[in-house]
């Protein structure tokens, strides 16, 4: 099946009568998930108890121990009937496993499933009991072993894996339906935008993971039921195992001329050849991974999303992600006139107070975070990669880079003068009022130790970065120097490239995606690393 489809759509519909399509669906979906947890957990416990009873009875019968009413000395029928009833009841409790497993074996187009091997083992063991009941002389407890116990144990392992999956989905849904804005990470699919934003990176086949704020993650339950990575191999092995079982049956029947031994060989191959942890082999790692992701507020719904995240080689981040609060510091103020220094601070803080840039903390900090001191800014305009233009008290105010000032023909100090003030990861911010330079601010960029460790881990994993920049001072040279990033592994988007990417990262009330996170760099990257 395609990655986006569950292996059995009908089963998914039974397990989840409602998809999470709006916040109003949360109570109903939560009830369905709680019910599923209760049913799968109860099934695993009941089938496990039945398996234990059958294994004990079978062992006692083989050793000649006194079984009381089930003693095989006089007749084997009471024991066989008891075993048959217990196994049939276990199979009935696991009816979805039986139905899905046998359907997957017969109809290859139905998709891959880990249910086939336990279903085959149960059918073969039931057949063994029925044949021994029909021909009691075929069954000798001292020489032949009933496979009902191992078959039920396989059903128990399968049910336990599904119970763990149910607990994982329920816990994930608690985070997904928390009623707060999150962010959804998804693979950028627009080929034109993809080429635009990755031009210049050394990655020949970029798979870009972008993130957008949202309130609801679409298709969460369907994603949670997606095909496991191991299902295809288990389905193929099930067909091979069935072939071996049939071969063992025919060989024993023809060579030993003993039908009882032949049916025991068939059941034995199917029971002992199947992995006990068929679903646990995927359920346990998924559970542990989700617990790790949940600690930093991330949710990866299912195996389809894990596979997709594993193919990602480019991440979209922002300057605020790379230079969190405290990493950018003010190193100097050079007003044109010394008496204008306070006004320069107020104008700069006013221009940056309501824009999404890491620089605003510096200027607001100089005012003591007292917004009452700020001036009203009208017609504020963001010029990507250049700076900001607005009007204060009827005067046009600009704050930004040298390129912004050159665009508006503002006279500036020489480039040689600027170079002397931009060494060691330092940059100059210009403030102009009414067409004239008003002040210069010197800021320094320092790497964040935690961010540096994360970026080093991403670099070693072969991931590159595109920086959707909200800081006009930020460029590739600064990032390569601050975080020791190789050339070709980081790209700062230009204004045109930012516009091309903007629709892909804009807020939507609901969005499809492969991972839900808190919107922070730690949650975004932490969830990706957990996957």
Feature annotation, model-predicted:
Residues 3-121, 128-237:
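Structural motif at membrane-water interfaces of alpha-helical integral membrane proteins
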Residues 86-97, 103, 148-177, 204-314, ...:
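Hydrophobic alpha-helical transmembrane segments
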Residues 101, 290, 321, 394, ...:
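Residue-level signature of catalytic and energy-coupling elements of molecular machines
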Residues 206-207, 392-394, 434-531:
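Conserved ATP-binding TGD loop and adjacent catalytic N/P-domain core of P-type ATPases
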Residues 221, 230-231, 334-384, 406-408, ...:
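ATP-binding catalytic core of ATPases
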Residues 305-332:
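Asp-based phosphoryl-transfer active-site loop
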Residues 316, 388-389, 427-433, 467-469:
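Cytosolic beta-strand hydrophobic patch enriched in CBS
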């Amino acid at each position: 099946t395609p990655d986006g489809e569950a292996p059995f759509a009908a089963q998914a519909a039974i397990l989840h009568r409602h998809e999470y399509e709006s916040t109003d669906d949360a109570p109903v979906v939560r009830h369905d998930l709680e019910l599923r947890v209760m049913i799968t957990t109860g099934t695993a416990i009941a089938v496990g108890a039945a398996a234990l009873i059958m294994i004990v009875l079978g062992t006692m019968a083989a050793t000649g121990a006194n079984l009381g009413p089930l003693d095989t000395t006089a007749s084997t029928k009471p024991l066989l009937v008891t075993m048959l009833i217990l196994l049939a009841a276990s199979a009935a409790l696991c009816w979805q496993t039986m139905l899905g497993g046998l359907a997957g074996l017969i109809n290859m187009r139905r998709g891959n499933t880990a249910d086939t091997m336990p279903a085959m083992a149960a059918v073969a063991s039931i057949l063994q009991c029925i044949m021994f009941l029909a021909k009691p002389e075929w069954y000798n407890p001292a020489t032949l072993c009933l496979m009902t116990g191992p078959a039920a144990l396989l059903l128990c392992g399968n049910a336990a894996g599904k119970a763990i999956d149910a607990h994982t989905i329920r816990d994930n849904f608690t985070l997904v339906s928390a009623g707060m804005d999150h962010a959804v990470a998804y693979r950028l699919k627009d080929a034109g935008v993809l080429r635009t934003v990755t031009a210049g990176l050394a990655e020949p086949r970029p798979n870009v993971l972008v993130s957008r704020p949202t309130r609801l993650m679409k298709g969460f339950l369907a994603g949670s039921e997606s095909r496991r990575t191991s299902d295809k191999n288990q389905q193929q092995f099930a067909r091979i195992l069935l072939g071996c079982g049939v071969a063992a049956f025919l060989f024993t029947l023809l060579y030993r001329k003993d039908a009882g031994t032949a049916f025991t060989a068939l059941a034995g191959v199917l029971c002992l050849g199947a992995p006990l942890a068929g679903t646990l082999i995927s359920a346990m790692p998924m559970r542990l991974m989700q617990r790790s992701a949940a600690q930093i507020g991330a949710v990866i719904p299912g195996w389809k999303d894990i596979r997709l995240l594993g193919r990602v080689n480019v991440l979209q981040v922002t300057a605020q992600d790379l230079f969190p609060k405290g990493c950018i510091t003010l190193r100097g103020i050079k007003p044109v006139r010394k008496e204008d220094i306070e006004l320069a601070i107020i104008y700069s803080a006013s221009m940056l107070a309501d824009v999404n840039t890491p620089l605003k903390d510096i200027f607001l900090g100089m005012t003591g975070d007292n917004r009452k001191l700020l001036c009203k800014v009208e017609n504020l305009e963001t010029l990507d990669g250049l700076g900001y233009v607005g009007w204060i008290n009827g005067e046009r105010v600009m704050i930004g880079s040298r390129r912004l000032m050159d665009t508006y023909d503002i006279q500036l100090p020489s480039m040689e003068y600027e170079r002397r003030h931009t060494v060691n990861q330092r940059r100059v911010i210009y403030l102009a009022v009414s067409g004239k330079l008003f002040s210069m601010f010197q800021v320094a960029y320092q790497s964040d130790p935690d961010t540096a460790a994360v970026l080093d881990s991403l670099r070693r994993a072969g991931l590159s970065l595109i920086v959707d920049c909200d800081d006009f001072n930020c460029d590739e040279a600064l990032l390569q120097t601050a975080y020791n990033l190789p050339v070709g592994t980081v790209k700062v988007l230009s204004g045109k490239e930012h516009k091309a990417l903007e629709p892909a990262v804009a807020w939507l009330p609901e969005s499809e995606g492969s991972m839900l996170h808190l919107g922070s760099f730690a949650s975004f990257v932490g969830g990706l690393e957990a996957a």
